[in-house]
Amino acid sequence: MGRSLKKGPFVADHLLKKIEKLNDNNRKEVIKTWSRASTILPLMVGHTIAVHNGRQHVPVFVNEQMVGHKLGEFAPTRTYRGHGKSDKKAGR
């Protein structure tokens, strides 16, 4: 179930201020954030946002197709290394 339209999308205040400041100065630089729950807004398009995945900051370049999604969707938190491989030597 989505968020109520009367509430509007959630975006962390500090992140919104940083992006508006960069847009006013027409600058593009990487913005570090821990706010994975923030919704991507149209004013974020074209910026690179480094989203924390619990271990490091993953750079995410925002494009038009990402608008409406959350930042955390583009920074995976788990590394899948595949299921256990069958060891032929152990079977002997």
UniProtKB/Swiss-Prot annotation:
Alphabetically sorted, this entry's keywords are: Ribonucleoprotein, Ribosomal protein, RNA-binding, rRNA-binding
* InterPro entries membership: Ribosomal_uS19, Ribosomal_uS19_bac-type, Ribosomal_uS19_CS, Ribosomal_uS19_SF
Gene3D superfamilies xref list: 30s Ribosomal Protein S19, Chain A
Which one of the record's GO molecular function terms can you name? Answer: structural constituent of ribosome
> A single GO CC term, please?
cytoplasm
Q: Name one GO biological process term.
A: translation
Q: Does the keyword RNA-binding apply?
A: yes
Q: Answer yes or no on keyword Transferase.
A: no
Taxonomy, superkingdom:
Bacteria
| Alphabetical list of Pfam families matching this protein | Ribosomal_S19
Q: Which HAMAP family match?
A: Ribosomal_uS19
Record family assignment: Belongs to the universal ribosomal protein uS19 family.
Q: What is the annotated role of this protein in its UniProt record? A: Protein S19 forms a complex with S13 that binds strongly to the 16S ribosomal RNA.
Name assigned to this protein: Small ribosomal subunit protein uS19
Question: Can you name the source organism?
Answer: Nostoc punctiforme (strain ATCC 29133 / PCC 73102)
Kindly list the organism's lineage.
Bacteria, Bacillati, Cyanobacteriota, Cyanophyceae, Nostocales
